[in-house]
């Protein structure tokens, strides 16, 4: 068979195999188009589970007459025009394949009118070449799409359709997911002429829990712990059910959204599961409705034709961010109740050294009274009840920050600290005016060596070795401990009994090195590290450090600092002149003994005399 270009209808039918899996897939694509068009009301009419009719009617901006034919063409879209648009996509659709694919396996009719047009127009495609016919029609501003006889021309696909009830249940689930993503849109779902679901638009933030209860049920609403967690460009909002009261019925509620797009992402599910693992049974699953907001440039949605999956550019950061956000609200729920002194009129719950969900470690409350309220992770329709201070909250309810006054002062001090890093404590007196130095940097050789000129001699200096000595000097405490830098997202690791015992024995020494942690039964939470470790991959470095400590019988700060300095990763895979000059200036200031007596592997003289003699001619 010779190579030939496929007919448009066949090409679209092949694409439909990826996009149009069942009637619910059609509903998803068409409703998302309505939302992208700015619709505030979408009516979905279904007959015979979607096999006979799928009608989507919206009050969006509509489609111009001259663009109707393009709307049914493959790879035609109004949502992106360049690669930059694709890399920063915020609309739900962008591939330009849905309508063409659907029309190739059904009898599709598109009717639309814009506010500028006096009349509406109707388009439909038919035949082998998918020729589009456009004619006048009566229709208000907005768009209606009718999909008749789905898979009528692909009998093999039609055989795989399930019963009418099963297919409609899938459609119902899609509408539930969309309703949770867009509280500002009214969604009406009808089946065989009967209104089955009606989700009214939320006028105020305080009514969101009403729609949440209508979709997820009262049991989930009663056990929901609100989350609002933020760090940099990442924001996590929503609800997670209290694992201590999660039932089998609730475990079916697992809804996750990335920038408003419904997702089934293993990374997100793993982070949530890991945060709840200590409170869930082996056969239990967490229940949650979570919304992740992230810079569109940091996530790739062009992974799956149906757009069910995403790929994060910094997946480890996203995983840890979600894990810490969920873990924080769960820990607030289970903290032991402690009395407050001069903070609240009655004994209230104060989680020691904890933060409110949705706040970073350095967040300062807008009002002083905000810090005086305990965490309020649950809410219900009524006022406080028998569960101890359950309150109804408006909008995105979240736990109020609870911490002690002394901790608040520490956080304010941290906030007022200049962004420039303080100079590390010198381990030896600095050289006066750099009377002794390595010399002048001439160039970089091999990417990690500096060619130096000093007093008429030429030397090669290993920059990674110099950096290791500098780190050891920065990590070794002088007259005072090394300054600890709190982590915005603490690192929680599972440890063995031997590792936990070693950490407890070395805790005071690690504190002098700027490493602060808290431990519980099976885990250790790293809360602060010294400045040289802030940019390191702590997920790898800290477990290796714990393993090293578990193998030691005695501990010394110098040995621990030396081990860390040897095992940290260099921040400079390729060195520049400016970086080399800055490094040598720091080494000369903090490690003058290296200038006087360079250790092995740091400096290597270059014999210029031999080279010059080789060039001399008789």
UniProtKB/Swiss-Prot annotation:
Compositional bias annotation for Low complexity: 366-378
InterPro entries the record matches: DNA_mismatch_repair_CS, DNA_mismatch_repair_MutL, DNA_mismatch_S5_2-like, HATPase_C_sf, MutL/Mlh/PMS, MutL/Mlh/Pms-like, MutL_C, MutL_C_dimsub
Compositional bias ranges of the Gly residues kind: 383-392
Entry's Gene Ontology BP terms: mismatch repair
One Pfam family hit: DNA_mis_repair
Keyword annotations of the record: DNA damage, DNA repair
Location of region: Disordered: 366-403
Any one GO molecular-function label of the UniProt entry: ATP-dependent DNA damage sensor activity
GO cellular component: mismatch repair complex
Family as reported in the entry's similarity comment: Belongs to the DNA mismatch repair MutL/HexB family.
HAMAP family the record matches: DNA_mis_repair (MF_00149)
Job of this protein: This protein is involved in the repair of mismatches in DNA. It is required for dam-dependent methyl-directed DNA mismatch repair. May act as a 'molecular matchmaker', a protein that promotes the formation of a stable complex between two or more DNA-binding proteins in an ATP-dependent manner without itself being part of a final effector complex.
Name the record gives this protein: DNA mismatch repair protein MutL
Organism of origin: Salmonella typhi
